[in-house]
Regions:
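Hydrophobic face of amphipathic alpha-helices that form TPR/SEL1-like repeat modules
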Residues: 1-28, 114
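Residue-level signal for inorganic ion chemistry
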Residues: 11, 30, 66, 88, ...
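A short acidic/small-residue loop/turn micro-motif
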Residues: 15-22, 38-42, 258
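Conserved C-terminal structural/oligomerization subdomain of aldehyde/semialdehyde dehydrogenase
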Residues: 29-35, 216, 307, 353, ...
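Short, well-ordered beta-strand elements within core beta-sheets of diverse protein domains
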Residues: 33-39, 54-60, 142, 252-255, ...
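Long amphipathic alpha-helix in the N-terminal Rossmann-like dinucleotide-binding domain
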Residues: 49, 67, 71-82, 94-120
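Rossmann-like NAD(P) dinucleotide-binding subdomain of oxidoreductase/dehydrogenase enzymes
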Residues: 123-262, 390
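ALDH superfamily catalytic-core signature
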Residues: 226-370, 433
Length: 472
């Protein structure tokens, strides 16, 4: 059994005087594989002070030095990618191929893209009679989730380093091993001593202190909408910048001109990737009402081909969800939908057949779901899809926008012009047209409405960590 200490301050892993531990549980077996030593409040204060003391040195790093640090981190990730993939599979149950080809690769791509941006980004521009400087915002607190652990941490860290900011990161306690490897990699880079600090423990204990702290200039948070609201309320006392990437209930509009035998399986796969544990997952599938019967048959047949099981097997497409809390929450959503007479066409409550342990959820689809039903409105964060019928495209757009969230949207159409016109009417931070996955990494990512504010990735992600200063 591992005992993990992830309290990394001023260039060293340090002990916590008051020992509090968090059990690390393998979601595929429910066995405890390790214990995380939680960061004490005293050491959290030390981490923030360390970042504050390193603020000026980080800000004064040349662009070449910032690029070199990012290149060193990139090399470290690539060198340890097999190890990291196995760790992510252990921590959150992601199928090993997904860990390698998505979890790790997306983080690598973000690093490469940020390095490329620094080749041409202008931190100083001359306007008509004045100069504009883009300067580091200062001490940044980065709070990252468990669902895409390495991708989310590298997205934020790469932008903060590129901007010249010092960092205190609080990764998810469920991802202690991958976080430790990342800290080791950054420690082997030329990052200024104290410029990168990590605290690890229960979010509800550390989060309020981070949110209210006077020495922290910015918080970048990815997680649930309710926690994001709590952070923003507490952060308002010090008027610090808060960038929030929160929940979603994304719609996927299937137009009536497509090959359903291709479009429906692709839509289901997109929804169920990472066991449905993605804030941008297209969990509402909007289809023409006159084709619903055909679509149901295709959906049932496809779900029955999805291999659920051991995440270390190359054959597995769907692993467990991350923990018992998530499993029970998803089961409750499914049960409530069944009890309220939603049309269950495949899946349902309990584990898949022949799986007796682990936090495995049956891939589940409901059809003819009323657009205002909780199963079509609440973020479930599991492999659960709601199929909703529409009368015409304007009706589809109305249904897509009938959500408190606005993170992402998807369109499948054989007519690019029609798809683009639809996309302009959808209230979401991004629209993905005829693609499996997010598409271009540099594209900005962030939400409308209760899906958050601010943007990550590419130039827009870098600029979240910069202040604008005019010299006249």
């Amino acid at each position: 059994m591992f005992k993990i200490n992830n309290t990394f301050i001023n260039g060293s892993f340090i002990q916590n005087n008051q020992k509090t531990y968090f059990d690390l549980i393998n979601p595929s077996s429910e066995d405890i594989y390790g214990k995380l030593e939680c960061t004490s409040i005293q050491n959290l204060e030390k981490a923030i002070l360390s970042a504050c003391n390193a603020e000026e040195e980080c800000a004064n790093l040349s662009i070449d030095n910032r690029k070199n640090i990012l290149l060193q981190i990139l090399d470290g990730i690539i060198e340890r990618r097999e190890e990291l993939a196995e760790i992510i599979t252990l921590e959150m149950g992601a199928p090993i191929n997904l860990s390698k080809n998505a979890h790790i690769q997306m983080g690598i791509d973000h690093l490469k893209n940020t390095i490329k941006i620094l080749d041409n980004y202008e931190f100083e521009t001359f306007e008509d009679g004045y100069k504009v400087l883009r300067v580091p915002i200062g001490v940044t607190a980065l709070i990252t989730p468990w669902n895409w652990p390495l991708n989310q941490t590298l997205t934020k860290i790469s932008s903060a380093i590129a901007a010249g900011c010092s960092i205190v990161i609080k990764p998810s306690e469920f991802c202690a091993l991958s976080s430790k490897v990342l800290a080791e990699i950054i420690n082997n880079s030329d990052m200024p001593r104290g410029g990168f600090n990590m605290v690890n423990g229960i979010g509800s204990e550390l989060g309020p202190i981070i949110s209210e702290h006077k020495m922290i200039n910015m918080i970048s948070f990815t997680g649930s909408t309710q926690v994001g609201i709590n952070i923003q309320e507490r952060a308002a006392k010090t008027v610090k910048r808060v960038s929030l990437e929160l929940g979603g209930k994304s719609a996927h509009i299937i137009c009536d001109d497509v090959d359903l035998n291709k479009a429906i399986p692709n839509a289901i796969n997109q929804c169920f990737i990472n066991s449905g544990q993605s804030c941008s997952a297209p969990t509402r599938l909007l289809v023409p009402e006159d084709k619903i019967n055909e679509i149901k048959k295709i959906a049932i047949n496809h779900v029955n081909t999805i291999k659920t099981g051991d995440p270390l097997s190359n054959e597995t497409a769907l692993g467990p969800v991350v923990n018992a809390k998530q499993f029970n929450n998803i089961q409750n959503h499914i049960k409530n939908a069944i009890d309220s007479s939603c049309e269950l066409i495949v899946g349902g409550i309990d584990r898949p057949q022949n799986i007796n342990k682990g936090f495995y959820v049956k891939p589940t689809i409901f059809a003819n779901v009323p657009e205002n039903h909780p199963i079509a409105q609440e973020e479930i964060f599991g492999p659960v899809l709601s199929i909703i019928t529409y009368k015409d495209i304007e009706n589809a757009i109305s249904i897509a926008n009938n959500s408190k969230y606005g993170l992402s949207s998807y369109i499948t159409s054989n007519n690019p012009e029609v798809a683009e016109q639809i996309s302009k009417k959808i209230k979401a931070g991004q629209t993905i047209i005829n693609k499996i996955g997010r598409g271009a990494v540099p594209a900005p990512f962030g939400g409308f409405k209760m899906s958050g504010n601010g943007r990550e990735h590419g130039v827009f992600g870098l600029e979240e960590y910069l202040e604008i200063k005019a010299i006249i």
